[in-house]
């Protein structure tokens, strides 16, 4: 995350809102001043040593500040990525609840509040929060509460949920190296290798490359040095949930009893976790889950619900081998071949892992062969294949995207068309828009259980859905082999690039209208162009295009380059080329997004200050849950008003966070 002015302001507001003014003051100084020792930090913050230690304790516990001891001095450095991750706490809890139920959400919530904590402390806090209160809200009889009260969770259930969260990567054990910044770790490893193996300095390019490779290897070992959380004799459970709405609903409904998904929460000593094990939230892995959810929403909107369920399960299988969205260039090895899939899922593996509650025969258009036009699809696939072959010939390697003739079987989407394609206008503002009525009747909403079908037929239906995903314009999937009825992979960089391009087009369309959208698409495809050529290609009057281009330049969406025809550099002998630098536009939009999020937080703080008395009254323990009985009608109206404003502002922050994820993190 960049340390721009608005990004620093946003992270400072987040820390201040959750952890108070003292922690926010220290964190802001570290963000603006950089890495500082205790004496310099004391001088800039004008705080006492005791106040600094209290604030740093909170920040270090939340991993908001790195620390590294060099001799007698300890240097502190702000972790801006962990500060921004506070925005996504609600999304992380929501995903955990969808996957594993309310117990997992409460465990994750405790880790959000505590930062890192021992398992015994987490269990104690959960049981403490679920103790019955003698305030009239619950009646305790023989050590149990009634249906309106609260209850404590069995230790076996909490242990099983913790194991599930550890298996999927939502949480991770805390290692000693996690408290040191990546820069300090790199410098320490480099210094040790230089002194031990190279006499203090390297000589020549060969030794520099060798040193770089050895540093990368040791950094990978340091990152993998985390405490082993698996008990002796532990076996991975086979009760992992499926990422679909049906399984999630069944899982949540079953939490009222003593078992979940048929699992008996007994005190199994062979799989009991160590109570002294320290855990924290793995934000890098949680970002992978948020990216998967965004891609599933994209597949749902472009193709259909059933296909999105299958795509979600495929992404879940791939996520088991993806520790983070963006690799660290100083630690992770670079991929030489961009088309070389590192993670492959076969149709057979996906079918076996798919939940039986999903009727895979629905969501696929059923039309006669006479009504299916596959010419456009064949043309697109042949074009992709030729492009891949040309790139492979240039690089001197064979293309990995070759497919057999059996792969070009006719398949359609729900509207009876082979795929969404542009019309004759190459710069249409709404490509692939089809407003005609559906020609096929679906049974997606049929609540009857799916009919029994053979395994081969189910695999064929799954393969049809995968072919729909592969044929989509967003390239949601790519076929890379024919083993076990097809091998599939996801080129995340390409998919996110298309998603980023779509979001950018939407923003430009909303702010500059149809003409601005067409002009940007022309410049994106053709590159730098003169004004008259842009107007000609976009089929727009030159006067209209000039007005829109100037307006977009004032807002930073496009830029202009002056190219003189001769050395005289006269204005009449100068060519003005318009272009759209998407990297610059993305950086500009990110900065404006951070500014909008910080303004939302500031507005929320102002609204809460205005209604501070009502909020304090509603937060009393004897009033919570019974506001209507204790508050007057005018007080209830004020409370509803402030809660509605809070919901609107926080919802806007979450929507803006989606843009940050698309443009930067995914």
UniProtKB/Swiss-Prot annotation:
Regions of compositional bias (Polar residues) in chain numbering: 135-153
Gene Ontology annotations of biological process type: DNA-templated transcription
Name of this chain's protein: DNA-directed RNA polymerase III subunit rpc3
Keyword terms of this UniProt record: DNA-directed RNA polymerase, Nucleus, Transcription, Zinc
Region (Leucine-zipper): 593-614
Location(s) in or outside the cell: Nucleus
Keyword Protein biosynthesis attached: no
Cysteine pairings via disulfide bonds: none
Record note on quaternary structure: Component of the RNA polymerase III (Pol III) complex consisting of 17 subunits.
Signal peptide: none
Function: DNA-dependent RNA polymerase catalyzes the transcription of DNA into RNA using the four ribonucleoside triphosphates as substrates. Specific core component of RNA polymerase III which synthesizes small RNAs, such as 5S rRNA and tRNAs.
Cellular component GO terms held in the UniProt record: RNA polymerase III complex
Family: Belongs to the RNA polymerase beta chain family.
Gene3D superfamilies linked: Winged helix-like DNA-binding domain superfamily/Winged helix DNA-binding domain
Organism listed in the record: Botryotinia fuckeliana (strain B05.10) (Noble rot fungus)
Superkingdom as given in the UniProt entry: Eukaryota
Chain segments carrying region Disordered: 130-153, 375-455
GO molecular function annotation: single-stranded DNA binding
Gene: rpc82
């Amino acid at each position: 995350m960049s340390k721009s002015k608005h990004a620093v302001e946003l992270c400072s507001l987040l820390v201040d809102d959750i952890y108070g003014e003292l922690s926010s003051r220290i964190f802001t100084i570290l963000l603006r001043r950089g890495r500082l020792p205790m004496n310099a930090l004391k001088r800039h913050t004008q705080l006492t040593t005791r106040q600094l230690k209290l604030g740093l304790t909170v920040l270090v516990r939340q991993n908001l500040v790195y620390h590294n001891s060099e001799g007698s001095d300890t240097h502190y450095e702000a972790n801006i990525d962990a500060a921004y991750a506070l925005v996504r706490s609600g999304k992380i809890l929501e995903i955990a609840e969808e996957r594993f139920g309310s117990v997992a959400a409460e465990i994750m919530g405790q880790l959000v509040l505590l930062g890192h904590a021992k398992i015994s402390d987490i269990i104690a806090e959960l049981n403490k929060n679920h103790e019955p209160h003698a305030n009239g809200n619950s009646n305790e009889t023989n050590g149990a509460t009634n249906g309106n009260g609260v209850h404590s969770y069995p230790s076996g259930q909490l242990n099983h949920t913790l194991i599930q969260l550890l298996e999927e990567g939502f949480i991770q054990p805390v290692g000693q190296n996690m408290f040191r910044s990546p820069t300090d770790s790199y410098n320490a490893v480099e210094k040790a290798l230089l002194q031990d193996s190279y006499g203090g300095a390297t000589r020549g390019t060969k030794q520099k490359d060798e040193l770089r490779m050895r540093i990368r290897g040791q950094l990978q070992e340091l990152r993998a040095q985390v405490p082993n959380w698996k008990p002796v004799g532990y076996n991975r459970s086979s009760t992992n949930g499926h990422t679909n709405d049906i399984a999630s609903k069944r899982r949540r409904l079953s939490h009222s009893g003593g078992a979940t998904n048929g699992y008996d929460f007994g005190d199994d000593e062979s799989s009991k976790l160590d109570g002294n094990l320290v855990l924290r939230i793995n934000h890098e892995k949680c970002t992978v889950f948020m990216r998967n959810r965004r891609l599933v929403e994209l597949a749902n909107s472009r193709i259909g619900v059933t296909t999105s369920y299958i795509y979600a399960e495929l992404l879940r299988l791939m996520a088991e081998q993806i520790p983070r969205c963006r690799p660290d260039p100083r630690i992770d090895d670079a991929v030489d071949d961009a088309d070389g899939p590192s993670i492959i899922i076969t149709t057979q593996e996906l079918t076996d892992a798919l939940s039986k509650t999903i009727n895979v025969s629905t969501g696929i258009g059923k039309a006669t062969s006479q009504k299916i036009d596959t010419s456009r699809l064949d043309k697109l696939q042949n074009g992709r294949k030729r492009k891949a072959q040309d790139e492979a010939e240039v690089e001197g390697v064979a293309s990995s995207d070759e497919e057999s003739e059996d792969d070009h079987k006719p398949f359609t989407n729900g509207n009876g068309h082979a795929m969404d394609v542009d019309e004759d206008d190459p710069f249409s503002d709404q490509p692939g828009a089809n407003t005609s009525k559906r020609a096929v009747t679906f049974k997606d909403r049929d609540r009857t259980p799916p009919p029994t079908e053979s395994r081969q037929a189910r695999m064929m239906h799954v393969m049809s859905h995968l072919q729909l995903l592969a044929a989509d314009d967003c390239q949601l999937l790519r076929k890379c082999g024919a083993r076990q009825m097809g091998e599939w992979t996801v080129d995340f960089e390409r998919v996110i690039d298309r998603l980023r391009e779509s979001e950018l087009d939407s923003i430009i369309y909303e702010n500059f209208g149809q003409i601005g959208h067409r002009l940007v698409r022309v410049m994106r495809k053709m590159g730098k162009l003169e004004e008259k050529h842009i107007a000609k290609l976009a089929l727009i009057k030159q006067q209209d295009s000039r007005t829109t281009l100037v307006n977009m330049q004032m807002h930073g969406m496009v830029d202009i380059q002056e190219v003189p025809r001769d050395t005289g550099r006269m204005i009449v002998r100068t060519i003005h080329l318009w272009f759209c630098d998407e990297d610059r536009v993305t950086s500009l939009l990110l900065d404006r997004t951070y500014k909008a999020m910080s303004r939302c937080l500031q507005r929320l703080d102002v609204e809460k200050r205005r209604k501070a008395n009502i909020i304090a009254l509603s937060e009393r323990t004897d009033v919570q849950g019974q506001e209507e009985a204790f508050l007057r009608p005018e007080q209830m109206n004020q409370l509803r008003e402030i809660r509605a404003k809070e919901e609107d502002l926080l919802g806007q922050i979450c929507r803006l966070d989606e843009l940050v994820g698309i443009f930067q993190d995914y």
